[in-house]
Curated annotation (Swiss-Prot):
Family named by the database record: Belongs to the UPF0434 family.
Gene3D superfamilies: 2.20.25.10
SUPFAM superfamilies: Trm112p-like
InterPro entries: Trm112-like (IPR005651)
UniProt-listed Pfam families: Trm112p
Protein known as: UPF0434 protein CBUD_1597.1
Length: 56
């Protein structure tokens, strides 16, 4: 994931910062506890495409 792109992108729901998960190929919003998928290097930032994070 391009570092500059990561600095520009924000959670579309809360407008908060996103964290890149290289293992899962997702962008994580820690505030909303949601993960946005990355397909073929393109972040899918649609709220309907998220998956909830499960706390362990």
């Amino acid at each position: 994931m391009d570092r500059i792109l990561l600095e520009i992108l924000a959670c579309p729901i809360c407008k908060g910062k996103l964290v890149y998960s290289q293992d899962e190929q997702e962008l994580i919003c820690r505030f909303d506890k949601l993960a946005y998928p990355i397909h073929d290097g393109i972040p899918v930032m649609l709220p309907d495409s998220t998956r909830p994070l499960i706390e362990r």
